[in-house]
Amino acid sequence: MALWRTSDSKVYLPPTPVSRVVNTDEYVTRTGIYYYAGSSRLLTLGHPYFSIPKTGQKAEIPKVSAYQYRVFRVHLPDPNKFGLPDPQLYNPDTERLVWACVGVEVGRGQPLGIGLSGHPLFNKLDDTENSHLATVNADTDNRDNVSVDNKQTQLCIIGCTPPLGEHWGIGTICKNTQTQRGDCPPLELISSIIEDGDMIDTGFGAMDFTALQATKSDVPIDISQSTCKYPDYLKMSADTYGNSMFFFLRREQLFARHFYNKAGAVGDAIPTTLYIKGAESGREPPTSSIYSATPSGSMVTSDAQLFNKPYWLQRAQGHNNGICWGNQLFVTCVDTTRSTNLTISTLSAASASTPFKPSDYKQFIRHGEEYELQFIFQLCKITLTTDVMAYIHLMNASILEDWNFGLTLPPTASLEDAYRFIKNSATTCQRNAPPVPKEDPFQKFKFWDVDLKEKFSIDLDQFPLGRKFMLQAGIQRRPKLGTKRPLSSTSSSTKRKKRKLTK
């Protein structure tokens, strides 16, 4: 006999619905008006390994290395205060204008080259690739002068908010955990904003070397007291609104050139079950098992360049399809294929000695970089419905403040006092304090500011990137100036005479 019974399994309840993230194409209307904007030649020069502080009358020399991030903060004009070719383009009562980045080209000057980095006191115990007998790990200074050609990187990230980077740093120790001096600290993956001048991953890992390497000699001197960051592609790709990364270009390559081990007491001893004890000196106890490799970026070539090329943004990887919120754009660049360091020598003695005497000369090293930024912006408009304004306010409330949206108070009919002289001791102190200027949310971060507020042009055919865009988009050039040549009166009269004769 069949008997029906209820299911013993748990009842499935659907998840609570969440608010849907809207793509910018759903509430942004693109117009057919395009503008070109380009920077001037952007130059920077300094010492490739460290900054030199002020000493006496000498000015400070900054640290400028090819292994630093260049984060350009591009300031754009407010399109709502822009002189438009068509005044009937939008209704300022119900609409607002924004910029959309549709084309970009990052130009790089200077020749291709490889710049070395290193440390005059590098912690190198043994050459573990070609070693015959291990060196006894005694309390002797085995540091040596070692130079390397770092990992080769080309990178370009475009977004309207600063890029994010990740690195390993010291984590938090639990309260119930007992630690002793010299123990390995817990590690934590830290995500932070990438600033201009931050060091990239040069092949030794993305970590806080200041806090995690007490010897100050395990890596080259340009990163021994720095934090190397690697772009947090996973977090930027998962950004809710897609503002930090519209798209990115990346090319990395390296190989291991030399293999060393580190001098010092090994914190985590090798278990005796993993080897058979030796008898000779250097084999019992075993020497250092802390191995590391020096990176090499290998050959640089013009066939694998990401820069000096135009890129067109048709569809961004996130929900923001190139809209420049806040009238700003962040361009993050790395290019180690032009890392040549300039060596400069000066005569310090009264005259040059013969034969050659090295102490008569001083040696200096500098590194210079050259950039140029070019953009194509499309003018767009947003219809300010209730849903759109609520969505933008949830994303970034300062956008509506920049659009001058707020509560308008009704005019008052009461009589108010207005003093003529207010900044003197005879007049009572005024209650109304001066308005506080708007705080920049990124003022505590360091960026390379590029002002393009007065460098917009609608004549695309006057600029190289503009002509490339017109060819790509199929836009016709404007007709040439001038009037058509009128037909001469003599030719017309002679034609009439010929017609009469034929009759």
Curated annotation (Swiss-Prot):
Residues 476-503 are annotated as: Disordered. One of its GO terms (cellular component) is T=7 icosahedral viral capsid. Residues 494-503 have a biased composition (Basic residues). Keywords: Capsid protein, Disulfide bond, Host nucleus, Host-virus interaction, Late protein, T=7 icosahedral capsid protein, Viral attachment to host cell, Viral penetration into host cytoplasm, Virion, Virus endocytosis by host, Virus entry into host cell. It is found in: Virion; Host nucleus. Belongs to the papillomaviridae L1 protein family. This is Major capsid protein L1. It comes from Human papillomavirus type 26.
